[in-house]
Swiss-Prot record:
This is 3-oxoacyl-[acyl-carrier-protein] reductase 4. It comes from Brassica napus. One of its GO terms (cellular component) is chloroplast. The keyword Lipid biosynthesis applies. It is found in: Plastid, Chloroplast; Plastid.
């Protein structure tokens, strides 16, 4: 009966969540996890419209609500339009997960410095700033920024990526201090090597080398990261956690 079903499903106030870079990988897993948990999810993508639509469709199949929004998080106009889309549709924004640009490339050219900074750091700043304006009015909100273990320990050939991700950690600590008086929690999640299209393409030698650096001896799954993000985004038990960096990397940064 309906009553039994209602009892089985815990009541959630359907928080409104914006997930950037949500068409694949970690972002997709986060969007699906939050959608399944009863959130209304804006699925942001930069180029992969078809994949993003699929994510939205899956959330709707779970009985959730979702909309897709194509936009570049390193462009202020796109970010403002994205937040406005969520507010126009659902009236508010409760949670923002800044995941766009979280691609762990093995090597990066120096010429890509600005591009990597714009996507990984400026994007987090712009999205956080736009969301905070909305959250401050209602004195409540949660922001989760996806950084990388590389931002903590560095990696040869990834100076730009490491600098951007370390920047996200420093930025988040400041944002947590600034948002605390308005009940806005800001935390960081630092994934290590997570199984993806890219790890699947690595040669056997490279894979062996990488797995050798991971004490648990395996890649993480996008769902591992999504589970931690869901806790930080929705759980009442996370309400007293702010300004913290959570490493989910199989032990790389021990």
């Amino acid at each position: 009966t309906t009553t039994e079903e209602e009892e089985a499903v815990p009541k959630v106030e359907s928080p409104v969540v914006v997930v950037t870079g949500a068409s694949r990988g970690i972002g997709k897993a986060i969007a699906l996890s939050l959608g399944k948990a009863g959130c209304k999810v804006l699925v942001n993508y930069a180029r992969s419209a078809k994949e993003a639509e699929e994510v939205s469709k899956q959330i709707e199949e779970y009985g959730g609500q979702a909309i897709t929004f194509g936009g570049d998080v390193s462009k202020e106009a796109d970010v403002d339009a994205m937040m406005k889309t969520a507010v126009d549709k659902w009236g508010t924004i409760d949670v923002v997960v800044n995941n766009a640009g979280d691609t762990l490339l093995i090597r990066m050219k120096k010429s890509q410095w600005d591009e990597v900074m714009d996507l990984n750091l400026t994007g987090v700043f712009l999205c956080s700033q736009a969301a905070t304006k909305i959250m401050m009015k209602k004195r409540k909100g949660r922001i989760i920024n996806i950084a990388s273990v590389v931002g903590l320990i560095g990696n040869i050939g990834q100076a730009n990526y490491a600098a951007a991700k370390a920047g996200v950690i420093g930025f988040s600590k400041t944002a947590a201090r600034e948002g605390a008086s308005r009940n806005i929690n800001v935390n960081v999640v630092c994934p290590g090597f997570i199984a993806s299209d890219m790890t699947a393409k690595l040669g056997e030698d490279m894979e062996k080398k990488i797995l050798g650096t991971i004490p648990l001896g395996r890649y993480g799954q996008p769902e591992d990261v999504a589970g931690l993000v869901e806790f930080l985004a929705l759980s009442p038990a996370a309400s007293y956690i702010t300004g913290q960096t959570f490493t989910i990397d199989g032990g790389i940064a021990i």
